[in-house]
């Protein structure tokens, strides 16, 4: 969560402030939620936040976190199976990507008071590496 708060602090301010943030994990997104709240921003009215993982706590944040659900248990089983095959000396091919789904909750909405219209390109502010 601290990584999300640190990333939030590096975002541009004022008119260049992003209207949405897609985080690498729910834990980072929860940190962004807290930092946005501390900065006086309203989520989702001023800033939309999306996490990744769909951890159980994502449904209990305020507001509830929109997130990308991944099949974590299936991912673990697949990793274990591939590891065992490699340890047995078998040739392992890359598996097909596992499916994900968007779980829309309360942390996302259209930008409020935005002059952007549907289909208009928005600016990519950049990636922030968190540690």
Per-range role (PLM):
Residues 5-119, 123-126, 130:
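Flexible loop/turn connectors
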């Amino acid at each position: 969560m601290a990584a999300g708060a640190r990333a939030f602090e590096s975002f541009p301010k004022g008119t260049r402030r992003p209207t949405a943030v897609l985080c690498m994990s729910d834990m980072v997104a929860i940190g962004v939620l807290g930092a946005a709240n501390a900065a006086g921003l309203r989520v989702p009215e001023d800033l939309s936040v999306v996490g990744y993982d769909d951890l159980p706590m994502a449904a209990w944040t305020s507001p509830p976190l929109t997130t990308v659900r991944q099949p974590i248990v299936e991912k673990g089983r697949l990793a274990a199976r591939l590891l065992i095959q490699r340890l047995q000396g078998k040739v392992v091919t890359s598996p097909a990507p596992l499916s994900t789904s968007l779980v829309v909750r309360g942390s996302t909405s259209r930008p409020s008071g935005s002059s952007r219209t549907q289909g208009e390109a928005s600016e990519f502010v950049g990636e922030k590496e968190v540690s």
